[in-house]
Amino acid sequence: MIRELIIFTCCLIGLMSCKQADSNIHVHYSQKVNGYDVSVKILPDSIQEGYFSDIATRKAELTFKRDGQQLIVENPCYADKSLTAESLTSGMTIDYIPFEMSESGTFRGNQSPFFFFDVDFDGEVELLICLWEGMGYRGYHAYQAYETNVGSGTHQLSPMQEAPFYELNDYTEFDPINKTISIPQGVGLKMNGEKVYGLVDGSFTLIERVQYDWEHTKGVKYEPCAPTIYHYKIVNGTEILDRIEKCPNDK
C-alpha cells in the first residue's frame, strides 16, 4: 500500500511539473540571426502591459543554437514589437527586427530585442540583449553584453561585468576609430555628465570624466541654454581638469 502511494505521489508530481512546463509560452524567430536559430521561452505570469509604453515586457529565456552550440540567456525585460499581451500564444513564429546603429554611434532608436555587435573593438561580435525600457524611461533601453566564444555544448551565459559593459544603454556612444566608449551619467531630463573609457593595453580603463553644471540655467526660461561642461583627464588614477566649455548665457 505504501509503495503504491509513493508511486501515485511521484506520478502526481510529474504531472504537475509537466503542466507547469506547458504553461510557458514558446516563440520562435523565422530568420537565423548571425547563424543562430533563436527561440524564446516566456514566463506567462511575468507579463506587464503598458508600464512605460504599449509594448508588453516579460521575463524570458532566449536560446541560440548553431553548429552544436547552444547558448541560453535570461532577460527580465524581454519585449518584441511583434508581440502584445493579447496576441501572445505558444508556438508563434515571428520575424526578427534587425538592429540598426544610429548615426550618432549610439543604440538610440533601436527596436531589436537582441543583436550581435562588437562592443570591445576586438573584431569579434558579442551578443547584446535589450532590456526593454530598462533605463526606467519611456522608450529608452538598457543592454547586457555576452561573450559567445565559449565552445560547443550548452552554456548558460552570464553578462560581461567589467566596466563599461555592465552599464550600456541607448545613450552609450561607441567610437571604433579612437576605440572609446562613453557612458552617460544621470540620464533623465538633464544629464549630469559622462564617463569615457578607452582601450589601453588590451583592456578598457577610465580615461576621462565629463561633468555638466546646470546651475546657471535655473533662471533661463525662454532661450536655449547649455550646461557648463568640465572635462577631467584621468592620469594614473588622478583627475586633472583639462578644459571648460562655457554656455554663452553663463554670465
What are these regions (language model features)?
Residues 83-112, 163-172:
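Repeat-based blade/solenoid architectures
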Residues 73-77, 156-163, 206-213:
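Beta-propeller fold detector
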Residues 111-112, 128, 139-143, 167-168, ...:
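Short, surface-exposed coil-to-beta transition loops
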Residues 18-70, 175-251:
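Acidic, small-residue rich beta-repeat scaffolds with periodic aromatic anchors
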Residues 28-30, 110-119, 166-182:
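Beta-propeller blade termini
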Residues 65-67, 138-160, 196-201:
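Beta-propeller blade repeat segments, especially FG-GAP/WD-type strand-to-loop junctions
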Residues 1-27:
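Bacterial Sec-dependent N-terminal signal peptides
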Residues 40, 119-131, 176-182:
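Acidic/hydrophobic-patterned starts of short beta strands in beta-sheet-rich repeat architectures
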